[in-house]
Swiss-Prot record:
GO MF term set: nucleoside triphosphate diphosphatase activity
Matching HAMAP family: Maf
GO biological process, one term: nucleotide metabolic process
Main function: Nucleoside triphosphate pyrophosphatase that hydrolyzes 7-methyl-GTP (m(7)GTP). May have a dual role in cell division arrest and in preventing the incorporation of modified nucleotides into cellular nucleic acids.
GO CC terms: cytoplasm
EC class (word): hydrolase
Protein name: 7-methyl-GTP pyrophosphatase
Site residues, Important for substrate specificity: 16, 74, 156
Taxonomic classification: Bacteria, Pseudomonadati, Pseudomonadota, Betaproteobacteria, Burkholderiales
Length: 199
């Protein structure tokens, strides 16, 4: 008799991450983690993304023993400086003016845990922004309202029009959940999307 696969939980309130995970056709539940996302003094952007992804996964795993939990976080950087979520129109406009014509790194970190063992990954995406006029920025912000998105650019929707190019080993990383790496990680926890068996 085949073993029953563990319950899968996505520690996220993001509908985009839910949509991405659903592509793998594994049944899952989404639970919003309660985690303080304040950066630590001097913390590197990649370290911040990894720390928060682990914290989110562990926060949910602590109350759901026997489950496999996915935590994720994304941090954007320009010239090594982190670019957070803007929170409102004026800050988003400032961010996009700064990013106009520039190369931006997006660190898409993930943690997968069963509460005992934890695996992590950080997939880097390099985005080159078009040179943006104020009119283009304002039109985008009015249409998209990307105030809860690192760097104010939602590549999964109209934000793709802000880009000149995107380079990554995983095309889903820019949206916040790198499915190629995640598939490998889940297989090691007994959740292979193709076979249902450990990879």
């Amino acid at each position: 008799m085949p073993a029953i696969p563990p319950k899968l939980i996505l520690a996220s309130s993001s509908r985009y991450r839910r949509e991405l995970l659903s592509r793998l056709r594994l049944p899952f539940t989404a639970i919003s983690p309660d985690v303080d996302e304040t950066p630590q003094p001097g913390e590197a952007p990649a370290d911040l993304a990894l720390r928060l992804s682990v914290a989110k996964a562990m926060a949910v795993a602590a109350t759901h023993p026997g489950s496999v939990v996915i935590g994720s976080d994304q941090v954007a950087t320009v010239d090594g400086d982190p670019i957070g979520k803007p929170g409102g129109f004026e800050r988003a406009r400032e961010q996009l003016r700064r990013l106009s014509g520039r190369a931006v790194e997006f660190h898409s970190a993930m943690a997968v845990t069963d509460g005992v063992h934890t695996e992590t990954a950080d997939i880097v995406t390099l985005c080159r922004f078009r040179t943006l006029t104020d009119a283009a920025i304002d039109a985008y912000l009015r249409a998209e309202e990307p105030y809860d998105t690192a760097g104010s650019a939602k590549a999964e929707s109209l934000g793709i029009a802000l880009m000149d190019s995107i380079r990554s080993d995983d095309p889903t990383a820019i949206i916040g959940l790198p499915l190629i790496a995640l598939t490998r990680m889940l297989g090691r926890f007994g959740l292979d999307p193709l076979t249902g068996h450990p990879a």
